[in-house]
């Protein structure tokens, strides 16, 4: 399998052909300020994220059209939007800051694509389109067949000879014409249960592959939808659930 350093800057290598958002890598507050300006802020909205992180930690959105007043009265306290001034103040609290990425903001449709592959050859591929996304969590989605999205991911899988279970995150630009790869996660993704609901149980199939068992030919049930809802549960003083 080709060695891919964790700090490899793929867009600097035109041979890979991978379409990614325009971005800058920064290590200091001053470099971040320069990157924000170079990428078009305040005319353009931007995303600022830690190069190493998970679960939406270290990610904020810069949008000059959203005021602090609007954030206070119209956004929940866990909003991902932040003002430029607050971002600079926050990052200036320490003498050093971790590597960060300043990138163009992609407001279009979000896709997650899950794979089970055999050393670069895809065995199963399931793509999920986000219908309602809140702080990077798909609250509702549909399993659909998007050839453009799957083709981009498949090229990466074959180029890097990826193996086992893993997943991609992609975002479209504002007019939903162009998909961009945002992340490649070398693990089972949090939304893989939706693939199982659509008839392709990737964790189970991954175990069968490792055990050398034959794998069935499967096609996802396109159109399968997931809607995440929260429901209160009530218990008595002894901890027994109340059904009423």
Kindly give the residue locations of the regions a language model identified.
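A short catalytic or substrate-binding loop motif that flags glycine-/basic-rich loops and adjacent residues
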Residues: 40, 52-53, 105-109, 161-164
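Short beta-strand or tight-loop elements
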Residues: 43-44, 98, 109-111, 164-166
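Short loop/edge segments at beta-strand edges and connector loops
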Residues: 27, 104, 166
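Phosphate-binding site of ATP-dependent enzymes
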Residues: 57, 72-154, 172, 179-180
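Short, glycine/charged-enriched secondary-structure capping and boundary segments
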Residues: 61-63, 117, 197-199
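Active-site nucleotide/adenylate-binding loops and adjacent lid/helix of ATP-dependent enzymes
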Residues: 3-99
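Electropositive phosphate-/nucleotide-binding environments in soluble metabolic enzymes
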Residues: 26-29, 110, 147, 200
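ATP-dependent carboxylate activation and anion-phosphoryl transfer catalytic cores
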Residues: 131-136, 142-244
């Amino acid at each position: 399998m080709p060695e891919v350093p964790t700090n490899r800057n793929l867009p600097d290598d035109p041979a890979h052909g991978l379409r990614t958002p325009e971005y800058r890598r920064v290590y200091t507050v001053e470099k971040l300020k320069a990157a924000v300006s170079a990428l078009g802020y305040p005319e353009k909205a931007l995303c600022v994220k830690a190069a190493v992180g998970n679960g939406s930690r270290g990610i904020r959105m810069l949008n000059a059209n959203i005021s602090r007043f609007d954030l206070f009265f119209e956004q929940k306290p866990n909003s991902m939007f932040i003002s430029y001034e607050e971002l600079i103040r926050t990052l200036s609290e320490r003498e050093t800051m971790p590597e960060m990425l300043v990138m163009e903001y992609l407001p279009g449709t979000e896709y997650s694509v899950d794979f089970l592959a055999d050393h670069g050859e895809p065995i199963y591929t399931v793509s999920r389109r986000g219908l309602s996304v809140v702080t990077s969590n798909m609250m509702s989605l549909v399993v659909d067949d998007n050839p453009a999205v799957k083709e981009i991911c498949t090229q990466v899988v074959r180029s890097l000879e990826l193996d086992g279970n893993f997943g991609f995150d992609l975002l479209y630009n504002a007019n939903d014409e162009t998909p961009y790869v945002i992340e490649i996660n070398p693990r089972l993704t949090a939304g893989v249960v939706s693939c199982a609901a659509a008839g392709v149980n990737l964790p189970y199939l991954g175990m069968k592959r490792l055990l050398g068992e034959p794998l069935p030919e499967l096609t996802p049930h396109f159109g399968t939808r997931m809607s995440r809802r929260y429901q209160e549960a009530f218990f008595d003083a002894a901890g027994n659930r109340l059904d009423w």
